[in-house]
């Protein structure tokens, strides 16, 4: 099959690799019809992680079941499914509590597993024609009948829609409240969209890319361009000097100041200053245990100079970490199905797998108009019209659940 393979920093290419196979009776093989390039893929693309050469990238995946292991009970060939980016077993101590982002089974020695991502285990990614999904009954969200026509909406359930929603959950956004969001990338836009759905009274979002700020305004946010205005001062002006009720951090360790210099603590400290006393923060931007290639000594050790004294004095609460996708994806799926949510508004490009290496270059450069890239491993027509799934031929016959 064809797949996007990581060769090294800023070097990915389409290669022919072996098809995945059923390795456990609970596995399923998914014929990937839509897969996204995620902003966090750029951490690996830029060489800021220890991703091994030869790894298939891609953790935002949607497709049709092509093959089922003998123990799979709820899925059948042809079903459209969306796969959470964090793979989980469903039966460990954390999974039983709904904390699927910290599964203790699939990545021995640490908490949390995922597809095609550094430090998250051996699973390959889904920027490919096929993907093996362990514990298929648990990990696959079966999609409604309109999935073939609305793949660009439903694929956002793999990561960024639940992650944006998670940011607002961690922050505790309630109807009528004000919320400040730092970062208008795909996750920040989904946080703004989630806040709008929840009925937030005032949504503010900080970035400096005009195309992203324009999208933020489409979901009811006041756009703050921090290359032109002091973001903290602007937030205080919009909130009668009090600060926002809630704050969301959707940037992570790659934060830059308005002059374009990488400053890892830039956003976190501004967020603390932007939220009112006794407010709360949701931090979903990726922060690394260590960042050896950073130009900042503290960041190389996974640390930052953080205004904890101000956080404490203001009595702020803070929630952090990866989203537990399965905690949200089913009811967010229903919002899409019922026409209450359309997260595909952020999609800027629909490309073939062969176009992905060039797309990575544009997306990494944050070029104007490159907001969210979706890839079609089976070609545009197969993805958009729901082409029938041919049964994959393997050396072993597997039961296909009905």
Provide a role label for each language-model segment.
Residues 80, 129, 142-229, 233, ...:
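Mid-domain Rossmann-like dinucleotide-binding core that forms the NAD(H)/NADP(H) cofactor-binding site
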Residues 171-172, 198, 214, 219-315, ...:
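Glycine-rich cofactor phosphate-binding loops and adjacent beta1-alpha1 units
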